[in-house]
Amino acid sequence: MTAALTVRGATKRFGPVLALDEVDLEVQHGEVLAVLGDNGAGKSTLIKCISGVHRLDAGEIEIDGLPVHITSPAAARAHGIETVYQDLALFDNLEPAANFYAGREDAGPRWLPRPLRVLRRRSMADATVELLERLQVSLPDHAATVGLMSGGQRQVIAVARAAVFASKVVILDEPTAALGVRESRRVLDLILRLRAEGHAVIVISHAMDHVTEVADRAVVMRRGRKVGEEIPSPDSQERIVALIVGTSG
């Protein structure tokens, strides 16, 4: 089976610091892959290279088995990769539909120059409601601005927005950080629904119980290198922690 995303020999330096050292990684369609590691392990650098924030110094990235050159976030999105960072990048003064389509507004008629086109607000709002219903995301008021919503509601909006435009891979950076039990549950359920719809999902997380629940595989990084891989389960948690802190073997 051809992987949705394959990374081979990913290497990245920042001056004298070797942030990524020949990292290999792959994730299949309909799979949740957790990338684990302590602070400074290279997790964030890896996803930023996949997302086009940083350029790899060496190595290659493939989408569905085909080499791609990801030189910017726009290039990553063009290849079907969407990333949700911890800050979510939502506009607090806009409602969910406007956040979904920010920078990708549906406007027409198409034969007019872009500055003269009229926003199709009703179409965007209806499409947003339809998507949220498909993903079983419930919001108290679709017309409310996201700044008035809870942390969990904001997180599921950001994840759902990524799912709208990600044809291949959704990357989630600490998706349950600072959320309560109920709000974390909403996000975890959404991750499982993304997997069921065939998305390849990469999750960066320190929450081992959440990783055990939703991830099919876990890759462990330390000091810029991939040091191991495990199937997350209660039985493997001790081995995963040993890989993270460097006491395995």
List each model region and its residues.
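Glycine-rich phosphate-binding loops of nucleotide-dependent enzymes
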Residues: 2-249
